């Protein structure tokens, strides 16, 4: 029997969402994604502490920021030894509202990868999908630095990223699901509100349809999954980035997987493009309580984990 994971790979590029790169080989993903929380989690495991310790030891007299950049590249370099495709490395979330510093950090990370002998075609720089992050991506893309727009929860963010020429977006399925489930409280009915009706799944489907309808080349990579059901409902999406625990569940399953998204079978096609000048973007984002709250929360969580990583480094100096 063909596993659900192998079936999914027929329709979608499978990406591993982890800093724990020793798990990669068994799932054979094309690409991999990391974020501050995943790197923080990894460096606290015995298997990866030596990478953190060596990076601090080699650059003991440099700034903490300098050391973190080298740590990100160390993880990215190891990951790229195990996959054929690209790795995503994230810009510090504390730069989410600073276009110029985000541009500078993106350039610096690419420079470090290239110094390690890795071509920029194998790297995606992750930026928060704020107005400022999207403007940074526009500049970086024009320089041949490909960007993965993260913390994306709404069509207006997706539309702005596509107009800016971003290589790829990461709409967060699970966090959208979490918000609506919490809002519904006791009224939430998983049988009725999950599956194809899952609000996170519907959000990605809407974005995918918008992109294909208007001919955007920005790749759509569903992210932040809570269940294999959410993944199966998005079979056919350009890419899906999946945590090792859910990759394992897909590998253990022989349930049939059918293509749910296809550029040749679009439903509920939009008739107009979303207005995305700065004022329109900010108003539409503000008008979406879920997207506003989850974007702010996501930035806070990633920023807090960056601070925790700094403290780990300080303790090793």
Swiss-Prot record:
Q: In which pathway does it act?
A: Carbohydrate degradation; pentose phosphate pathway; D-glyceraldehyde 3-phosphate and beta-D-fructose 6-phosphate from D-ribose 5-phosphate and D-xylulose 5-phosphate (non-oxidative stage): step 2/3
Q: Which UniProt keywords apply?
A: Cytoplasm, Pentose shunt, Schiff base, Transferase
Q: Its Enzyme Commission number? A: 2.2.1.2
Compartments, record wording: Cytoplasm
Instruction: Kindly state the subunit structure of this protein.
Output: Homodimer.
Source organism per entry reads Burkholderia vietnamiensis (strain G4 / LMG 22486) (Burkholderia cepacia (strain R1808))
Keyword Cytoplasm present in the record's keywords: the answer is yes
- InterPro entries, from UniProt? Aldolase_TIM, TAL/FSA, Transaldolase_1, Transaldolase_AS
Q: Mind giving the lineage of the organism this protein is from?
A: Bacteria, Pseudomonadati, Pseudomonadota, Betaproteobacteria, Burkholderiales
Protein name in the entry = Transaldolase
């Amino acid at each position: 029997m063909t596993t659900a994971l192998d079936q999914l790979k027929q329709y979608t590029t499978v990406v591993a969402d982890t800093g724990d790169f020793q798990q990669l080989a068994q799932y054979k993903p094309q690409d991999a994604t990391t974020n501050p929380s995943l790197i923080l989690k990894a460096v606290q495991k015995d298997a990866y502490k030596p990478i953190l310790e060596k990076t601090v030891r080699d650059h003991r007299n440099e700034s903490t920021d300098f050391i973190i950049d080298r740590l990100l590249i160390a993880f990215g370099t190891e990951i790229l030894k195990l996959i054929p495709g690209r790795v995503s490395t994230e810009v510090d979330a504390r730069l989410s509202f600073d276009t110029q510093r985000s541009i500078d950090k993106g350039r610096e990370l690419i420079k470090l990868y290239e110094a390690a002998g890795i071509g920029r075609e194998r790297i995606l720089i992750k930026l928060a999908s704020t107005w400022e992050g999207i403007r940074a991506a526009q500049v970086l893309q024009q320089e041949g630095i490909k960007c993965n727009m993260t913390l994306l929860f709404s069509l207006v963010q997706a539309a702005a990223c596509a107009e800016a020429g971003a290589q790829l977006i990461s709409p967060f399925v699970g966090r959208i699901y979490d918000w609506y489930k919490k809002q519904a409280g006791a009224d939430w009915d998983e049988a009725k509100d999950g599956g194809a009706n899952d609000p996170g799944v519907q959000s990605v489907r809407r974005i995918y349809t918008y992109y294909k309808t208007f001919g955007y080349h920005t790749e759509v990579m569903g992210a932040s999954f809570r269940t294999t059901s959410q993944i199966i409902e998005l079979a056919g999406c350009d890419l899906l980035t999946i945590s090792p625990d859910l990759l394992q569940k897909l590998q253990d399953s022989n349930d049939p997987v059918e293509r749910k998204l296809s550029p040749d079978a679009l439903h509920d096609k939009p008739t107009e493009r979303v207005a995305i000048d700065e004022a329109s973007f900010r108003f539409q984002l503000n008008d979406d309580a879920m997207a506003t709250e989850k974007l702010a929360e996501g930035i806070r969580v990633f920023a807090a984990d960056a601070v925790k990583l700094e403290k780990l480094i300080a303790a090793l100096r």
